[in-house]
């Protein structure tokens, strides 16, 4: 499971700049998805072979009367408490402040790995001008410039060092094949705990032992109709003896970790409220991680026909990037519509791990070009020659040819539709990458 790094500090010290610096390598992955809402407070980052989740906790603004704890939002406090390591960002140019002392006091009491980063330190003599920050009692001060990218790699290495991480490739290899890792995601009070407890109470769910569970993560392995599942905690699962039950608890950290460690995500939407900003952010994170997804609209029994139409329309307009997902209308309390969910979950998992042969992909590509050729862009008309699979979970198709940088988004969607129909890719995102061949005569022509 990916570790979580929380960026903490008072306002305007450069946390957002550092966040953007750490996560910018991931932005290109989701740039092609129309309508995607990206929450700028959390994202994925990678350094070397180590991937991690970054959370920008926002600014701490303690007031004189209540102090820091009244001003800290509940989720912010929880995110910091649940993070694996904290990067405390201070302003090297402004120097130490009373707010910095308050935050440092809170972090010392928290007692978890913490790295102190003095931002905006470009051009400074680290030793002389940063010595005052030792007063915070958090050890060594590390000079960085988030805006210029100075000292960032060393900072991340220091932050991840106490966690003794294994390489991401090794972690992926340890996943037991044939087990569908399922996360139930959704905002607070959407009915996650009710649905999970309903599932856990079914006689058809038979628990089995699963070796090598990930660190500190509560997950429930079970079997249903011959298929093994592992339910990854997002709702606050707790163990009572040999029995698990879910409590209604929302944790950003747990949700993000569960999504990235799952194969399939069941996204719950509240029918009484429709799609909210938080729903869209969670959906965006699911897509960013390339996870298969099934949408379930809960509390369907509690709304009238007019509200039902509004909910359906809000899903179409606010989650257009998930139109590949199957949608179910359910009531967890009345156990209505729950049975078909399992078939859709299995279908999404199968689609995400679909194997596609090069001859079939190339045939489909050439048939698509013959049916509708890509538009010419100025002097150039893209020539699509052959295709092959570049990965699974999610499926990646790589198309080779010439002048492929001129392929339009509309044509890319046209190709995606053809591939999805042929391989029945329901419930999974897919990615199409274009690789243009270099012109061997280009240099000679300009010589």
UniProtKB/Swiss-Prot annotation:
Pfam families according to UniProt: KH_dom-like, MMR_HSR1
Keywords, in A-Z order: GTP-binding, Nucleotide-binding, Repeat, Ribosome biogenesis
GO function terms (MF aspect): GTP binding; ribosome binding
Domain KH-like: 354-438
Record-level GO BP terms: ribosome biogenesis
Matching PROSITE patterns: G_ENGA (PS51712)
Superkingdom of the source species: Bacteria
Keyword Repeat listed: yes
Keyword Zinc assigned: no
CDD domains with a match to the protein in the record: EngA1 (cd01894), EngA2 (cd01895)
Family: Belongs to the TRAFAC class TrmE-Era-EngA-EngB-Septin-like GTPase superfamily. EngA (Der) GTPase family.
NCBIfam families for the chain: GTPase_EngA (TIGR03594), small_GTP (TIGR00231)
HAMAP family according to UniProt: GTPase_Der
Subunit and partners: Associates with the 50S ribosomal subunit.
UniProt name for this protein: GTPase Der
Phylogenetic lineage: Bacteria, Pseudomonadati, Pseudomonadota, Betaproteobacteria, Burkholderiales
Gene responsible for this protein: der
